[in-house]
Amino acid sequence: MSPHFPALTPDQKKELADIAQRIVASGKGILAADESVGTMGKRLTQIGLENTDEHRRFYRQLLFTTDPSIKEHIGGIIFFHETMYQKTDGGVPFVKLVKDNGILVGIKVDKGVVPLAGTNGEGTTQGLDGLAERCAQYKKDGADFAKWRCVLKISPNTPSRLSIVENANVLARYATICQQNGLVPIVEPEILPDGDHDLKTCQYITEKVLAATYKALSDHHVYLEGTLLKPNMVTVGTAAPASTRPEQVAMATLTALRRTVPPAVPGITFLSGGQSEEDASIHLNAINKLHLIKPWALTFSYGRALQASVLKAWGGKKENLKAAQDELMRRAKINGQASKGEYKPTGTGAAAGESLFVANHAY
């Protein structure tokens, strides 16, 4: 068997590995601010704002101009396409603002979930057409890493083998295209929390999905040291009758990861999956407190679980800007502590304890 072509050069590999390690340096995680125009519209509507370019720009500016010390807890921020090319009130491009503060810039590159023919309502993710050209342009424009989300559902008949294999291969094709263009790929095979499944079922499905994903990454010659994984935590379904303790979620999650994710992967950045802000932090903390060998950084890539309280504090009013930024800093610090197993819950505000679950969530 001959080696694959074109192979990454040693310099390309070093750049990718360095980027991945910087993003998940000790105590740091990712702020996912890559909500689509439609999803941002839903967020803005909740606080009585119209979904306009300027409202979206102002909100992202609020996030990105939070005190520079946030870099102690945030290693990377994922942008949406329009955000890559927006500027502050003072004319500073958001990309420059973030990078000048030592935070790496990511970009969402998938084009959303579409139906997968031959399955019972399952999907695959589109966006491979033209991906190489887009990645090359994003790299020129300052991006360091990319994100691509695939979605799988748990039901009596899903995920099907077809869905698991198809989504694994799509993620692998995306990952190798990113690496050829100097971007670290975040590989995100999200198993939705919708349903009434128990913890064992979620763990079993998570293991099968991750095993297939890493088989595909190997088949496509992806350089694992220059990747990050963004998985779901292993939890019961949102409609499940029984609740679970954080220690149970932590053990099921870590067991699934230890069985499937190679130690070459530098970091695992969990998605919050509709958990409340506080639950997402408590579960991350519990995972990191487990006394088992953990060969990767275990940290966060949260969107809703970093921003829900921020949006409420802001309420669309400029006079609330500082209060909203203080809330972002607080949640970032909490999750930074949780990524080291050092978070001590002190009770939560009403917003932090609210479930952020959205059925069949789409970005």
Curated annotation (Swiss-Prot):
The record marks Y363 as: Necessary for preference for fructose 1,6-bisphosphate over fructose 1-phosphate. PROSITE patterns: ALDOLASE_CLASS_I. The active site is at K230. Pfam families: Glycolytic (PF00274). GO terms for biological process: glycolytic process. It comes from the Eukaryota. SUPFAM superfamilies: Aldolase. Substrate binds at R56, K147. It catalyses: beta-D-fructose 1,6-bisphosphate = D-glyceraldehyde 3-phosphate + dihydroxyacetone phosphate. Its EC number is 4.1.2.13. One of its GO terms (molecular function) is fructose-bisphosphate aldolase activity. Keywords: Glycolysis, Lyase, Schiff base. Expressed mainly in the skeletal muscle, heart muscle, brain, and some other tissues, but probably not in liver. CDD domains: FBP_aldolase_I_a. Pathway: Carbohydrate degradation; glycolysis; D-glyceraldehyde 3-phosphate and glycerone phosphate from D-glucose: step 4/4. It is an enzyme of class 4 (lyase). Homotetramer. Belongs to the class I fructose-bisphosphate aldolase family. This is Fructose-bisphosphate aldolase, muscle type.
